[in-house]
Amino acid sequence: MTRNPNKKPNPEIHIFHNGEVAEFDYFGDFAKFLSDNDARVIVRNYHKRTKGKAPWQLIDEAVRQRISKKDGDQVWCVFDIDDYLKDAREKFENGLKKAKQHGIKLAWSNQCFELWLMLHFNQVSTSVSRQDYEKKLQNLFKEIDVDYHKNSLQLFHKLLPLQPKAMQRAEKIFQKDQPQENPSTSLFLLIEELNNFLNQ
């Protein structure tokens, strides 16, 4: 088949994570879901060189990759706030500025990615520790007959029917450019961006 030289290439979404497993698997499954549904987008998931990095180091790595933003391509950094903001505020804030300068979009969760998972079941309006998220999620997943643990596979597919509610709840507690607010997450902005390609 002859390739049409005038056909616009599919945009690419480059996602950098600093989490150990859960985020990488979640967005890997999301990418496959988009591909299976003929979405006109390519999702590239980066994890090997960035897991365990502080948010500003994650942003540095994304900048180092020198990814072009042509043809609608985007670069996102997905990270937990944890204690980074409290323990290294200057480095954290400088990282946010650097991301803005280089057109890198941020999908953060305060305190952690588990907040996003929790929002599929309930609204969260008070601060919750990482340990408490684990306990609460185990009980909530039992309600949908899923044995949850931190590195559970296929979380994306298991939670997909509940995603619209999670989006609404995340937006309700989100404050732009205020990652210090706990609980809060901008992760829904990346989810929204990816979902937009399903409707094109």
What does each of the following model-derived ranges do?
Residues T2-H14, F24, G28-H47, V63-Q200:
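C-terminal accessory helical subdomains adjacent to catalytic cores in phosphodiester-
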Residues G19-E23, K51-I59, N182-S186:
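Phosphate/oxyanion-binding active-site loops and adjacent basic polyanion-contact surfaces
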